[in-house]
Each structure stands twice: as C-alpha cells, then as structure tokens.
Amino acid sequence: MYRAVIDPAPDHTAFTLLRDDEVLCVERRPMRGRDAAELPVFILETLTAHGAAPGDVKRWTVGSGPGSFTGLRLVAALTAAWCLGKPDVLSRAVPGAVALAGMLRPAPGEKAGAVYDGRNKEVLYFGVEGMPGNDVRPTGETAVLDRERAAAFFGDRPGERLAMFSCEETAVRAVLPPGATGESFAYSDTVLLDRTSFQPFDNDLTRPVYIRPAVYTSN
C-alpha cells in the first residue's frame, strides 16, 4: 500500500512516498508563497518517477504547521481533492513541528520544542514529548515569544532542547536567551509524520496550527 506525506516548511515543501514499510523517496523542492502553484506538478512528477499516481496512494498525511497559512491551506485542499469520493483512501493532519522537533530524537518522556521565526522579533514555540519507538507527540503547549517573554519562558525550562530550521536560525537565535539549547536543521523528519501514532486517520484536514491568532480585516 502506498502512503504519502506532504509537509510545507519555511523555504521548501517536502514530499515523502512509502510503500508498505519501505521509504521510496523523500523529495524536497524550494517553495514559498508565489511558488505554491508548482506543488501539484512537483507531487505528480515525483509519483510518476516511482510508477505511481495520486489514486494509488491510500494514506495521506499532511503537515499542518505552523507555517504559511496559504501554503498550509493549499496542501490541505490539494490532498482533500485527491481523496474525494474514495472511501478506501484516508487522510490526516499532523503538525509539521512534530517532524522538526523529532530531529532531536527526544527520549521517552523528554520534553522538547520546535521554534520558528514569528517575524516582528518573535518566535513561535511548539512543545513535544518523546514517546517509545522514537515517536513524538505534541504536549499541547504553544507560545508566541518576544525576547523578554522568551527569557522567562525558557528560564522555567532549563536544558529543554529546541529545534529550528537553518533558514530561520539567525532570526530565531536573535530572540532566544543565551542559555537556550537550540539545534538547527536544514530539513525535518517527514518519515516520522507518516509513522507517528498519536493522530488517527480521520479525514479532517481543517486543523492548521495557528499559534498566532489569524488576523481578519474588513472593508
């Protein structure tokens, strides 16, 4: 059975294809806002290269952020379209932060965090906990932190390890306190998004991670 993961990251989108327990590929393409129109072509080209088509994939996992609202919604909408009217095809949304923090390989019971550039000299924090079998699950704790709040927040968590994307490292470290233990990674562990067990395949792709409340405007 084919399974697939689509996870939008700050400077790229990752596509992972598996067949049963075999990882066939982990492909990444630089992609930001205006490049999002390339996503369907990227997915189709990768599937074709491995002798598959969207209809062959029976389990879809979508990275749900945090990230660009436009990118998250596009990935969810595209996946929902490929699943529409197919009772044997299941999908789910799993926070991409799980894949990023999973790069730290937290031990069972260990708390860790993924941190993102929140712009405006702030970082977005997403907490996770290590589980048996190299699994990771969210703790439910999220925060928007400027330098002052970050100093107090991480001061209460001495030694907690943090993961960040390399493309955001400069901006993130400018906000983190000097004692924070952060590691940067070019990519996240998207295979973990497929194999994590905390989130069932419920066909609900409408739960993007909004750590910072969405801003609405009116005319």
Please provide the spans of the model-predicted regions.
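Short amphipathic alpha-helical face segments that pack within enzyme cores
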Residues: 38-41, 77, 99
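DPxDG-like acidic metal-binding loop motif
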Residues: 59-90
